[in-house]
């Protein structure tokens, strides 16, 4: 049976080496996020200040996988 993941939204606060990021979730928890393979393959740039969707395991709530970068309202693209 596949493990159920919790999906949260958050804000990238800091960029760390090797595709890791510090993410502040909407419930004010800080977790460590890493980029999913699909985002890595698509060359999607994630920078501090971006809003993202992050998938968190219910067994380890301190780490999560960034699965989607949300569009900024003030960008032109």
From Swiss-Prot:
<dbReference type="Pfam" id="PF01176">
    <property type="entry name" value="eIF-1a"/>
</dbReference>
<dbReference type="InterPro" id="IPR004368">
    <property type="entry name" value="TIF_IF1"/>
</dbReference>
<dbReference type="InterPro" id="IPR006196">
    <property type="entry name" value="RNA-binding_domain_S1_IF1"/>
</dbReference>
<keyword id="KW-0396">Initiation factor</keyword>
<comment type="similarity">
    <text>Belongs to the IF-1 family.</text>
</comment>
<comment type="function">
    <text>One of the essential components for the initiation of protein synthesis. Stabilizes the binding of IF-2 and IF-3 on the 30S subunit to which N-formylmethionyl-tRNA(fMet) subsequently binds. Helps modulate mRNA selection, yielding the 30S pre-initiation complex (PIC). Upon addition of the 50S ribosomal subunit IF-1, IF-2 and IF-3 are released leaving the mature 70S translation initiation complex.</text>
</comment>
<dbReference type="InterPro" id="IPR012340">
    <property type="entry name" value="NA-bd_OB-fold"/>
</dbReference>
<keyword id="KW-0934">Plastid</keyword>
<keyword id="KW-0150">Chloroplast</keyword>
<feature type="domain" description="S1-like">
    <location>
        <begin position="1"/>
        <end position="71"/>
    </location>
</feature>
<dbReference type="GO" id="GO:0005829">
    <property type="term" value="C:cytosol"/>
</dbReference>
<keyword id="KW-0699">rRNA-binding</keyword>
<dbReference type="InterPro" id="IPR003029">
    <property type="entry name" value="S1_domain"/>
</dbReference>
<keyword id="KW-0694">RNA-binding</keyword>
<dbReference type="GO" id="GO:0019843">
    <property type="term" value="F:rRNA binding"/>
</dbReference>
<dbReference type="GO" id="GO:0003743">
    <property type="term" value="F:translation initiation factor activity"/>
</dbReference>
<keyword id="KW-0648">Protein biosynthesis</keyword>
<dbReference type="GO" id="GO:0043022">
    <property type="term" value="F:ribosome binding"/>
</dbReference>
<dbReference type="GO" id="GO:0009507">
    <property type="term" value="C:chloroplast"/>
</dbReference>
<comment type="subunit">
    <text>Component of the 30S ribosomal translation pre-initiation complex which assembles on the 30S ribosome in the order IF-2 and IF-3, IF-1 and N-formylmethionyl-tRNA(fMet); mRNA recruitment can occur at any time during PIC assembly.</text>
</comment>
<protein>
    <recommendedName>
        <fullName>Translation initiation factor IF-1, chloroplastic</fullName>
    </recommendedName>
</protein>
């Amino acid at each position: 049976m596949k493990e159920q993941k919790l999906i949260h939204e958050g804000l990238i606060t800091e960029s760390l080496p090797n595709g890791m990021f510090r993410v502040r979730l909407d419930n004010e928890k800080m977790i460590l996020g890493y980029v999913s393979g699909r985002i890595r393959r698509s060359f999607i740039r994630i920078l501090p200040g971006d809003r993202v969707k992050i998938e968190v395991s219910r067994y380890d709530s301190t780490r999560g996988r960034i699965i989607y970068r949300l569009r900024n309202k003030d960008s032109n693209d």
